[in-house]
């Protein structure tokens, strides 16, 4: 049985980012994490580790009986997409609220990484947590719709990460 989590807002996650004993809460769709993302092109070349730690947006966090929590994330990049429909731009105010830089950024909707929580590729920020915060619900919906359109055409590459 799979249990899906729902989008959270930055306000609802802010006070709950660290659990007693140093554990991190299970991420919710829309949460933004620091993660060593492995691009599909890198995985195709045989790489197993992402070359750069970057913000990623949680697309899905699902409980699989016996396996744990499987988390799917989409990368945020400074590179503008070749095709506008391949990414969703992150507004400057959202980047500011997350504590990200001022450069233009996009959420890529044509590929994702999938891993068992808390995989080895999460990267703690200054506060010891990998959480930047969460994107607004309306931006999450745009990202999810973009992924859905590409998935319907068989154009979303899923890179499974080592546990």
What kind of feature is each model-predicted range?
Residues 41:
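Glycine-rich nucleotide phosphate-binding loop and flanking beta-alpha elements
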Residues 1-17, 83, 90-163:
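C-terminal terminal-subdomain/extension
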Residues 45-53, 58-96:
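Compact nucleic-acid interaction/catalytic patches
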